[in-house]
Design a protein with these regions (language model features):
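Short linear capping/connector segments at secondary-structure termini
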Residues: 2-7, 38-46
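Positions in alpha-helical segments
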Residues: 2, 15, 36-37, 50, ...
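Hydrophobic alpha-helical connector segments
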Residues: 1-30
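Hydrophobic/aromatic-rich alpha-helical bundle segments in the mid-to-C-terminal region
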Residues: 71-117, 125-130
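Short coil/turn helix-boundary motifs
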Residues: 10-11, 31, 45, 103, ...
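Alpha-helix initiation/capping motif
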Residues: 6-13, 41, 52, 56, ...
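Amphipathic alpha-helical packing segments from all-alpha helical-bundle domains
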Residues: 22-39, 46-73, 82-86, 111, ...
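Secondary-structure edge/capping motif, primarily at the C-terminal ends of alpha-helices
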Residues: 35-42, 99, 103
């Protein structure tokens, strides 16, 4: 997570998104079992639930900042931005990562899958048809 300031400062928001996804993949993979337990506990423990909610909120803010930069540069339609943020939030979630790694798929491949799906979502948000 120490790479976040550098990633968010990337002048190319599309590149920044790809790099941000790499950061999340590395984070989710670093201590996968512990994070899975925390998410499980968070479902029944209000304090852990608040911590997970706060982390997800920070992730949404980072994604929103990148998407807003894409809108400002003309890469994404303004009307498509809210939905794009929601899709990117789902794609970068621990739950999505855990599903893709559950069968033993390597983290590098999972990261590439998430990056490709995210790039596709951005392309869809840039076109006139969704």
């Amino acid at each position: 997570m120490s790479r976040l300031p550098e990633v968010m400062a990337d002048v190319d928001a599309l590149s920044g998104l790809q790099r941000l996804i790499s950061v999340f993949c590395d984070f989710w993979a670093h201590d996968h079992d512990l994070i899975a337990r925390l998410h499980s506990v968070g479902a029944s423990d209000p304090e852990f639930s608040q911590a997970v909610f706060a982390r997800n909120k920070r992730r949404r803010l980072a994604l929103s900042a990148l998407v807003n930069r894409m809108v400002n540069s003309g890469h994404v339609r303004n009307a498509a931005a809210p939905e794009l943020v929601d899709v990117l939030l789902a794609l970068t979630s621990f739950s999505f990562f855990a599903e893709l790694t559950a069968g033993g798929r390597p983290v590098e491949i999972v990261c590439r899958i998430v990056q490709n799906l995210s790039a596709d979502a951005v392309r869809r948000a840039s076109s006139d048809t969704t």
